[in-house]
Amino acid sequence: MTIKKGYVIENEFELYEMCALNNSESVFDLLALYFSNEENIKNKILFNQAKTVANDFNLSLEHDVIVKFCNALSVLQTANAMSQYITKVDSHNNIRSEPVDFVMFGDSITDWGPWYELFPKKKLVNRGIAGDNTQGMLYRMGNILPLNPKKVFIMAGINDLSQGFSIKSILKRYCKMLDFFQMNNIEPIVQSTLFVGKRLAALNPLVLEFNQNLQDICKDKKISYIDLTIVLSPNNTLPSEHSRDNLHLTAIAYQKWAELIRPWLRHD
């Protein structure tokens, strides 16, 4: 792929268009290529925001505005993520769904799955929330009870690992979830945590150890464990075919995931 000399991305939607036109390229490679053009260094998407931050802190752009800007942007992003999280939890707690048979429970990898399209004839709901970890899922698991599902499909752990939580502490919280669902006559179906792509590869040894321990726990508790990694992240890494950003999944990956869990989406 080449980018024309002098081409400037004016907004985030143009970034989306660039990715759509070059769907074999990773997002990171496209951005690296774009910013390798000298003309674009002064025209990055957030440049005007950087100037605003500079003015707020009475700094020149030649000063430490970059650090200040990144700090301010981090606060804004965190606030936005928390706002979305709180709003979604509030909806799950207060906007009641009819009773269902199956619940998909997890973080963004679950949240962004097109489950209704993949299983149009199944009575299921999506209870994934982007950015969540096992602490948040423990807090949220109670809002699944009113749905009276037969089974809950769980994927969790990658955000905990990336946030530095120990495998032991994550598994302890995971076990609390499993015990909670079993005590309430809901069958938990555990899905392996997926490996990540090359840019996040430092997490993969932890994912491997985590999954091995999780599988042992499921065996002891007589809980179904579905190893998604065999198909979705073989060779202990998430291939570019299955992810554009080394973490979240492509449509083809969700289709493969759906086929792997289809045998469990039935009434026993």
Model region roles, listed by residue range:
Residues 155, 159, 177-208, 232-235:
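Active-site segments of SGNH/GDSL-like serine hydrolases
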Residues 167-176, 206-211:
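Charged helix-capping and loop-helix junction motifs
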